[in-house]
Design a protein with these regions (language model features):
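Terminal substrate-recognition subdomain of acyl/acetyltransferases
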Residues: 1-41, 159-194
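A conserved beta-strand-loop-helix scaffold within acyl/acetyltransferase catalytic domains
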Residues: 5-130
Length: 194
């Protein structure tokens, strides 16, 4: 983009933004407090798993179900081999959100210098589980676990770089700050009338 990005009227828009939160996670917004209320009300808990059966269940019934419900035919997913390779390599972890004995959601934690939420999903992409606080739990429980492990920051992963993007807006309720962006993007050149 260097040839295109040359003037004061040129604007670079990255495809993806990365955001982080400070740990311990503090619920200061009305939305975050409501998420925590739902988690407590429904007595959601979490567990970490490396069990192959749990990985397959998460991949098929949470991750794929969620992205296919959200993106339908345009969904592009990682293969199970790629997914399980990332989870089983290094110290990466699958965190499952549970209601009783049922895993209702999950998120993969990439255990880097600043641990990162990689992919998440809700069982059967269920709105019932969403209303129970499953989405908030995929942020709250990793933050709780990482705080207990001594981490001071957690990456919330990538979001589209448009401020009206729903995922980016959701992350704002947890007081995130933008910590980086993709090198891939587009350049907008502002033209003048001739």
């Amino acid at each position: 983009h260097q040839l295109l990005y040359q003037g004061a009227k040129d604007y670079y828009i990255p495809l993806w933004l990365e955001s982080c939160v400070e740990l311990p996670l503090k619920a200061t917004t009305k939305g975050a407090k409501e998420d925590l209320r739902r988690i407590r009300k429904h007595q959601l808990t979490y567990e970490l798993s490396t069990d192959l059966e749990a990985l397959q269940d998460f991949y098929n019934n949470m991750y794929l179900a969620t992205i296919h419900a959200r993106h339908e035919k345009s969904a592009v997913s990682s293969s199970f081999e790629e997914f399980s390779g990332v989870v089983s390599s290094s110290d990466n972890k699958l965190l499952l959100v549970k209601h009783g004995e049922t895993a209702i959601a999950g998120v993969v934690l990439q255990m880097t210098a600043v641990p990162r939420l990689w992919i998440a999903g809700i069982r059967d992409s269920s709105n019932t589980y969403r209303r129970m606080g499953a989405v908030g739990a995929t942020y709250h429980f990793p933050a709780q676990y990482l705080t207990e492990q001594g981490y001071r920051q957690m990456s919330l992963g990538r979001s589209r770089s448009f401020f009206n993007d729903g995922v980016l807006q959701y992350k704002a309720k947890w007081n995130h700050h933008l910590s980086g962006f993709d090198k891939d993007g587009m350049v907008v050149k502002m033209l003048t009338a001739s």
